[in-house]
């Protein structure tokens, strides 16, 4: 077990390069099941969730080579074990994304009910109902999803609520289905667009990417390709908040600012100066104390739930009062007690946190609970007076590539040590 030790109060300055998107890499890796040949991915992030996905695919019969330049060669074209075991699935919610591709290509799958961050129920019923609409026979028994199909048949899918992973699963399943599938109330996240772009390059026929209505015309087969994963907008947003909360100036490279408009608007409201270029964002807080900003999470293109915890930490030391409302997950405020231990003035009322900004936080001994909550504690530690120790940082490794090394490049005093 590792922990992070942070000596806070240092303004961050410099340049940092974001990794490829975690939320693009995982579905694209599962999409490799659909291909009749190998896939090469570039800009692949080195994350524990990526490693778990690769172990899961390898357990099914895939082969892969991970290069030092963040390129990944994977051949999932001939799986021999159509079972996603609990010991691998339990740590990662995205493992449900194996279901659609396996059903589409092999007409059967056995998937353990998934795990991942403990931030709400995140039901899989949307996935299962939609797959049944496509012609699958599904039962859930002893913690496993058993799915079979003679052949998936295109149809209209109407999601009762917007779900990123359900949208991705059904898109992948429909690529090899017979006929046309139309998904209504589809999620519009950039990572879904990235998945669709990869599938189209593989030979899929898909229209409507980035809209709420996506149409897929099934094809007989998909081919292997070389594809570059898009930059991680949540990692980029987290480092921009790090500069804002410490009063620093940083430039983020390998970033697509067009996908981050909702985040950038809120950072501008804090008083930060922001300059965007083709592949970079520069934020300058000029040593100022940030202004408090109200946050309400929603589906893309609105403010992302994956940035809520980071902005809660920012508001904790901002000038003024703010509210942070979470509309996506019902249990995504587990960072509140930890921030309060540092001196933050936070009151949780239902799905809203009322925050009165304090001038400074004090370093404390903290316990990470999930991926983005962990990031918020790191941000708070960077801004705090004194030393902050954060336990259970394996949560961070699920979504941030070498976070302490990148923060060191910006001047942070942060170390990873083993218990």
From Swiss-Prot:
Q: Which residues carry this modification: 2-(S-cysteinyl)pyruvic acid O-phosphothioketal?
A: 117
Keywords on record: Cell cycle, Cell division, Cell shape, Cell wall biogenesis/degradation, Cytoplasm, Peptidoglycan synthesis, Pyruvate, Transferase
Q: Which CDD domains match?
A: UdpNAET
In this chain, phosphoenolpyruvate is annotated as bound at 22-23
Where's the active site on this chain? 117 (proton donor)
Q: Name one GO biological process term.
A: cell division
* Annotated localization: Cytoplasm
SUPFAM superfamilies attached to this UniProt entry:
EPT/RTPC-like (SSF55205)
Q: What is its EC number?
A: 2.5.1.7
Q: Which GO terms describe its cellular component?
A: cytoplasm
Q: Which GO terms describe its molecular function?
A: UDP-N-acetylglucosamine 1-carboxyvinyltransferase activity
Where do the annotations place UDP-N-acetyl-alpha-D-glucosamine binding? 93, 306, 328
Known catalysed reaction(s)? phosphoenolpyruvate + UDP-N-acetyl-alpha-D-glucosamine = UDP-N-acetyl-3-O-(1-carboxyvinyl)-alpha-D-glucosamine + phosphate
Highest taxon listed in the record's lineage: Bacteria
* UniProt entry tagged with the keyword Cell wall biogenesis/degradation: yes
Pathway(s) it belongs to: Cell wall biogenesis; peptidoglycan biosynthesis
Provide the top EC class: transferase
What the record says about family reads: Belongs to the EPSP synthase family. MurA subfamily.
**Role noted for this protein:** Cell wall formation. Adds enolpyruvyl to UDP-N-acetylglucosamine.
User: Which protein is depicted?
Assistant: UDP-N-acetylglucosamine 1-carboxyvinyltransferase
- Which gene is this protein's source? murA
